[in-house]
Amino acid sequence: DDVISLGVGEPDFDTPWHIRDEGIYTLEKGRTFYTSNSGLKELREEITHYLKRRFELEYDPMHEVLVTVGGSEGIDVALRAMLDPGDEVLIPQPAYVSYLPCVVLADGGPVTIELQEKNQFRLTKEELLAHITDKTKVLVLPFPNNPTGSIMTKADLEPVAEFIKEHD
């Protein structure tokens, strides 16, 4: 009981009933068909409304929003769109097991950055400086981090953001 599993994301609780009830309701209504590959139109529209309200950003839900089944699929699709053969991708470690293979499948070169427990597994500007090259194109910044649960605060992220802007 005192062991915390750091394995693949299996919750240690049952799915709440309000979620189960909605699934049952949806099945009873006959909504058992595939959605569009880009995601439900209504969800894409709601995402654009949220982005407008929260961040004053405007996107076309029909052409600029893609709903994936999870974060890993989204990262995979983004890497395949951005990488050219030989481009390097910085991946802080430990990290979710799929990031490195996604880079390899997109013809990129994964470069791992071993995060330090003394920094609570938070990425630092110094660690970026030690790993960036002229081939670096992408930084995977997966926080909150799986499997450590590490979270980067705004104060942690600001120097990283400055570094990224400096190295475009």
Indicate residue ranges for each PLM-predicted region.
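Conserved PLP-anchoring active-site segment centered on the Schiff-base-forming lysine
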Residues: 81-103
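A short helix-loop-beta submotif of the ANL/AMP-binding
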Residues: 104-111
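Short glycine-rich anion-binding loops that position phosphate/pyrophosphate groups of nucleotides
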Residues: 11, 72, 96, 143-147
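Glycine/Thr-rich phosphate-binding loops of Rossmann-like dinucleotide-binding domains
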Residues: 14-16, 75-76, 99-100, 148-149
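Active-site phosphate-binding strand-loop segment of PLP-dependent enzymes
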Residues: 111, 115-168
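N-terminal small-domain helix-loop-helix segment of the aminotransferase-like
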Residues: 1-69, 77
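Short acidic capping loops at alpha-helix termini that bridge into adjacent secondary structure
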Residues: 59-65, 85-88, 135
